[in-house]
From Swiss-Prot:
Ranges occupied by Kelch repeats: 137-183, 184-229, 232-280
Name the record gives this protein: F-box/kelch-repeat protein At4g14905
F-box domain mapped to chain residues: 34-74
Organism: Arabidopsis thaliana (Mouse-ear cress)
Pfam families: F-box (PF00646), Kelch_FKB95 (PF25210)
InterPro entries tied to this protein: F-box/kelch-repeat_ARATH (IPR050354), F-box_dom (IPR001810), Kelch-typ_b-propeller (IPR015915), Kelch_1 (IPR006652)
Domain of life: Eukaryota
Keywords: Kelch repeat, Repeat
Length: 372
């Protein structure tokens, strides 16, 4: 349109050409926002395994797939998924790499699962770090860098793989027992004893660490594992198990569990599961105080053992990731069956399949379930 024609249009409508151009640009911007809102609403209903393929369609789709809005929408419409994150350390280079267990796009069976790398995952100290998950977030506590213990605490948002830091702990730590209980972050042990802050707690509202308990008159051996159940932190040593109850503010020794659990275990609905013997799993009901051995689950693969396997609660199922050979990782899932509360516990083998092959020997350091 020529300048004279635009002036004629402006004189007829009573509006300047510049104003009409601004209104047109504003309409286009509003339309783009509306299109984004519609796209986010649609994509939020699509399983995450298709997101990499959708991201390849165009730059705008790639931007939307990485936006926090799509995960907010997934939460609102209750389409979140329970995703497994696995930390794998190379025995040759000692580097830590992160993977997620995803379905192959257009896969139709359980064997379509695979571990895919997460190159954007923030770096984590090389040794002794405690890693836990809650909702869509992963907490990274302490560790050892260049032979020195650190007191740093970071929080990774697994929706965007971005990281923020909490204030440093009072004590540097490695291999600490950690639990999120009643909206507070408790950290137990892992520091040089004796310490006035052997147990400390982070108050998210005040954003401060407080010393809770010193280590007095308690003979604790080296920590091998820990878990949180019934708002208590269970610390597993080589020969002992101590339970820290934040409400009572003290430790109590659990003699029964101390004889059973030392390396790898996983709590699901007040029941603790762990490796018992080669290719056997023991379920221990903490409420009833009784254990059940899953003898010879049909289809259970050879090679399950605590020194190479990691257990995790995967949406109420028991997922086990383990080394089947020096370079292969397999995943097994077991459905937990129980007639009623306090009743007999049994396990049903669902499937086992190969999910990753690496070129070098490795250690499965950690397995976490994250909701996104």
């Amino acid at each position: 349109m020529s300048r004279s024609a635009a002036s004629s249009v402006g004189s007829i409508t009573g509006e300047s050409p510049q104003k009409k151009l601004l209104q047109s640009a504003s309409s286009s911007s509003s339309l783009a926002i509306l299109h984004d809102e519609i796209a986010v609403s649609c994509f939020a209903r699509v399983p995450r395994c298709y997101y990499p393929a959708i991201s390849l369609v165009c730059r705008n789709f790639r931007r939307l797939m990485a936006s926090p809005e799509i995960y907010i929408e997934r939460s609102v419409i209750r389409r979140t998924e329970n995703i497994l994150y696995v930390a794998i350390r190379s025995e040759a280079t000692k580097t830590l790499s992160w993977y997620t267990l995803n379905l192959k796009p257009f896969g139709t069976t359980e064997i379509s699962h695979r571990l895919v790398p997460v190159p954007s995952f923030p770096s984590i100290p090389g040794y002794g770090t405690t890693i836990i998950s809650s909702g869509s977030e992963t907490y990274v506590i302490g560790g050892c860098i260049d032979g020195e213990l650190v007191s740093t605490v970071s929080v990774i948002d697994c929706r965007s793989h971005t990281c923020r830091f909490l204030p440093n702990m009072k004590e540097p730590r490695k291999c600490a027992a950690v639990g999120l209980i009643d909206g507070k972050l408790y950290v137990v042990g892992g520091c040089n004893a004796p310490s006035l802050s052997w147990v400390e707690v982070f108050n998210f509202k005040k954003r401060t660490w407080e010393s809770v308990l010193s280590l007095d008159n308690v003979d604790m051996d080296e920590q091998m594992n820990f878990f949180v159940m019934n708002d208590k932190i269970y610390r597993i040593g080589q020969n002992t198990m101590f339970v820290y109850d934040p409400k009572k503010g003290r430790f109590e020794e659990d003699l029964a569990l101390g004889r059973l659990w030392f390396n790898e275990s996983c709590p699901i609905d007040n029941v603790l599961y762990g490796f018992y013997c080669m290719n056997q799993i023991l379920a221990y009901d903490l409420v009833v105080g009784m254990g059940t051995v899953f003898w010879g689950l049909e289809g259970l693969p050879e090679g399950l053992q605590s020194c190479t396997g990691r257990m995790v609660n995967h949406g109420g199922r028991l997922a086990i990731l383990f080394k089947k050979s020096p370079t292969e990782i397999w995943r097994t899932e077991i459905a937990i069956e129980r007639a009623e509360e306090g009743g007999y516990i049994s396990g049903k083998f669902l499937w086992s399949n190969h999910v990753l092959t690496l070129t070098d020997s490795f250690i499965i350091e950690r397995a976490l379930a994250v909701t996104v």
